Amino acid sequence: MYYKFSSFTQKLAGAWASEAYTPQGLKPVSTEAPPIIFATPTKLTSSVTAYDYSGKNKVPELQKFFQKADGVPIHLKRGLPDQMLYRTTMALTLGGTIYCLIALYMASQPRNK
């Protein structure tokens, strides 16, 4: 005797061997090919203009600029914006580290009852 879970009665019910070994919802796939559906062609507009957004290749210039031996660290070569970004990153890193250490200290202290 084979049993299969009945989703209607929410209990085990008797079943044939072929039904019991086939998981619910999974049946053999049919071998018939689905009908071919062709998409309707879209109408292209005739006023298409091409723009070149890539611009000039700046890589060789930037390589020369960053490889220049002027004693300035690489992360500060571009001046004030790089300095501000560096200082902001360091301040946020230090602030986050201090915050985590304070949170760990507070979590390690027992509460008074």
From Swiss-Prot:
Swiss-Prot/TrEMBL keywords: Acetylation, Membrane, Mitochondrion, Mitochondrion inner membrane, Transit peptide, Transmembrane, Transmembrane helix
Bilayer topology annotation: Single-pass membrane protein
Query: What upregulates or represses it?
Result: Specifically induced in muscle upon exercise. Expression is induced by ATF4 downstream of the EIF2AK3/PERK-mediated unfolded protein response, thereby increasing formation of respiratory chain supercomplexes.
Cellular component terms per the entry's GO annotation: mitochondrial inner membrane; mitochondrion; respiratory chain complex; respiratory chain complex IV
Q: Which CDD domains match?
A: Cyt_c_Oxidase_VIIa (cd00928)
> Which biological process terms from the Gene Ontology are attached to this UniProt entry?
mitochondrial electron transport, cytochrome c to oxygen; mitochondrial respirasome assembly; regulation of oxidative phosphorylation
Would I find Acetylation among this entry's keywords?
yes
Q: List where in the cell it is found.
A: Mitochondrion inner membrane
- Define the transit peptide region by residue numbers: 1-54
Q: Which InterPro entries match?
A: COX7a, Cyt_c_oxidase_su7a-rel_mt, Cyt_c_oxidase_su7a_sf, Cytc_oxidase_su7a_met
**Residue spans crossing the bilayer:** 81-106
User: Which Pfam family, an example, fits this chain?
Assistant: COX7a
Q: In which pathway does it act?
A: Energy metabolism; oxidative phosphorylation
In alphabetical order, the GO MF annotations are: protein-macromolecule adaptor activity
Residue numbers bearing the N6-acetyllysine modification: K68
What does the record say about the knockout?
A: Knockout homozygous mice manifest decreased mitochondrial respiratory activities and impaired formation of mitochondrial supercomplexes in muscles. Mice display muscle weakness and exhibit heat production failure in the cold.
Q: Which PANTHER family match?
A: CYTOCHROME C OXIDASE POLYPEPTIDE 7A, CYTOCHROME C OXIDASE SUBUNIT 7A-RELATED PROTEIN, MITOCHONDRIAL
Outline what the protein does: Assembly factor that mediates the formation of some mitochondrial respiratory supercomplexes (respirasomes), thereby promoting oxidative phosphorylation and energy metabolism. Acts as a molecular adapter that associates with both mitochondrial respiratory complexes III (CIII) and IV (CIV), promoting their association. Mediates the formation of various mitochondrial respiratory supercomplexes, such as MCIII(2)IV(2), composed of two CIII and two CIV, and the CS-respirasome (MCI(1)III(2)IV(2)), composed of one CI, two CIII and two CIV.
| Assembly notes | Interacts with the mitochondrial respiratory complexes III (CIII) and IV (CIV), promoting their association.
**In its UniProt entry, what is this protein called?**
Cytochrome c oxidase subunit 7A2-like, mitochondrial
Organism, per UniProt? Mus musculus
